[in-house]
Amino acid sequence: MKRFIFFLIITSMVQAADKGKPLPPVPADVAGQKAMGAALAESLRGMRLVNEAEIKGNLRIRKPRGKRENVPVTFRAKADGAAQVEIFETAKGTLQIRKTPNKPNEYFFKAPGAKVGKKMEGEQLNQIFAGSDFTLGDLGLEFLQWPNQQVIGRASRLRETCNILLSKPAKVLPGGYSHVKCWVEIHNRALLCVEAYRGGKRVKLFQAKSFKKFEGEWQLRELELRNDVTDARTQIQFDLRAPRK
């Protein structure tokens, strides 16, 4: 079994599918593609950790004019009843995301020095996190919550066969994305690449960059976000030697 982390979130801690089993084709009709897309998005939303997890890493930020910054980050995930709680902690603020089956994600951002977190919703999810190019909604994979999901094809990414999932919101919010394309590895359902668009223009590219075999399993070591509008970059580098709970 492989473990991947997509956007700091461990997705494939469930048993991988049999790679020798024939893959069902992508339907030729739009209705069938939407049904497949809805099922895929639901399965991704429903992934849960078996145990609590803690992973340390760094946000390596390159600003549009070349200035660089390094921000240590700690990712924690734990179960709370049927919900999964994911926490991204930095010296610049802490984001908590509560994911409950069949309910919208809940986001709470606690600024440095604040006693409690502020609930974030709507356009507030476009707020950047810790000076990086990640928004709060990016970290919560908010596009998987959108009502319009469609598998539009199949392609190889990082030498893995992937379904291409097209996600569209019910309404495009100011500063938000008009649609998102993601390449989902078929057997482990790991997101290997994500492209975010405004209108017909791609504005962000999220891509797994390197992996390392750790404790007998392949794990993501580096994820890069490229901002096509500003030419800024943010790399998340994970310390795979960090102890896990």
State the predicted function of each range.
Residues 42-44, 72-77, 207-213:
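Extended lipid/amphipathic-ligand handling interfaces
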Residues 70-111:
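Mid-chain, structured segments of secreted extracytoplasmic proteins
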Residues 158-245:
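Gly/Pro-enriched, hydrophobic low-complexity segments
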Residues 48-64, 84:
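A short, Trp-centered hydrophobic/proline-enriched beta-strand micro-motif
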Residues 55, 83-87, 105-110, 118-119, ...:
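Short hydrophobic/aromatic-rich beta-strand segments that constitute the beta-sheet cores
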Residues 4-12:
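Sec-dependent N-terminal signal peptides
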Residues 18-42, 48-49, 67, 101-178:
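Flexible, processing/modification-adjacent segments and terminal tails
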